[in-house]
Amino acid sequence: MPTILGQNQYGKAENRVVKITRDGATHHIKDLNVSVALSGDMDEVHYSGSNANVLPTDTTKNTVYAFAKEHGIESAEQFGIHLARHFVTSQEPIRTARIRIEEYQWERISASDANSQFIGADEVKHSFVRKGQETRVTQITYDGSSWEVISGLKDLVVMNSTNSEFWGYVKDKYTTLQEAYDRILATQVSGRWRFNWTDDEQRMPNWEKSYEQTRKHMLQAFAETYSLSLQQTLYQMGSRIINNRSEIDEVRFSLPNKHHFLVDLEPFGLKNDNEVYFAADRPYGLIEATILRDGCEPKIPVDLTNL
């Protein structure tokens, strides 16, 4: 045979599921985008077209919605674990399941002063507004014996309006950038972190608390680091997470440097004391790195888009 089959997988991508949990008059929302990828004994469907080992992708879609009812959605990670375990243990030909989930965050809408007196609460218990552009993500991979859980976020935009410098860099005949001793530092964070929970015998992390605390440490490190380079800030963000979250062994960030350039106001007879900037959307510097707990091996892909 002149050709052979290489790596392959199949499943149903981007199953949008919204789960409403009703606690009396108070409602809670989980809004997920779930993608299922299955692999295993799938040679014949490629070579001969035999579907004998194929679980239809429509069935994987139906499973996502059924599990939202049967198991609920405590967290994106826990929901993905339920799905991955089911596909591997219930279908003999399937040896590995990879579940990717994006979670969209919602927060309650505050009631007006007059209405809060009427309903006896500061928030409307069934009304929500989508929170910014930040998206929570997770990927769960299960091969029947071990787990890999990589979680994170994307599109979290942050800015320091001072306490950032950039100087002392290499200069050649093409360098025009002026050294900066007080600049805006802004980025759109894409980050992933890998948990050291890999076995059912281990104690499972509290996924919701872990995400909340990891995000907190990441933002605090960004805010509290007097930055001489975005690389330095990135390293401090990852180190803060690993030093404070024992369940995480590896962090990877991709941070575009959202450049803000001082506008020359002298033609208008005005002085610009680091107050008026032009926000450039492209081109941008792109800073990427992995931070590891000492003694651990890197496993998060270098290109986060390949997760």
Model-derived segments and spans:
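N-terminal intrinsically disordered, cationic/polar leader segments
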Residues: 1-216, 220-307
